[in-house]
Amino acid sequence: MHHEPATWRRVLDLLAPCEPVVVYLFGSRAHGRSRQDSDMDLAVLPGRSLQPMAWFDLQGRLGEELGVDVDLVNLAEASAVLRKEILAGGKVVWARDLQQRAEWEMYALSDYARLNEERAPVLAALGQPLAGHAR
């Protein structure tokens, strides 16, 4: 599947119920390492919350429309670690407002930094380094 403008217009049309603030492509498709059977990993920061079943339905509709399995992540509900991984390795495919995007990314990264500070004593007691830090 190609990531052409028409593809992203279809994605955005389908995501309209959650009023996306920013949409990221992550995983193998974000880095040109996908195979024919690779799924599409999308992360969305919604401007409007949806019930979990609505997210599930949205994921299914995206998969049907795009002809690939879609893994749809709601960034408002994702863990600090997953959000950081998406920011570190994902690509922004659409943003409604650059200021909102920048503010959210700063929040997500500071939340991850706070998590690392909070878990550092526990990991040190267990003799494990923080992810991304050498011993």
Please describe what each predicted stretch is.
Residues 1-24, 31-35, 47-135:
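Catalytic core of pol beta-like nucleotidyltransferases
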Residues 43-45:
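Short hydrophobic/aromatic beta-strand micro-patches
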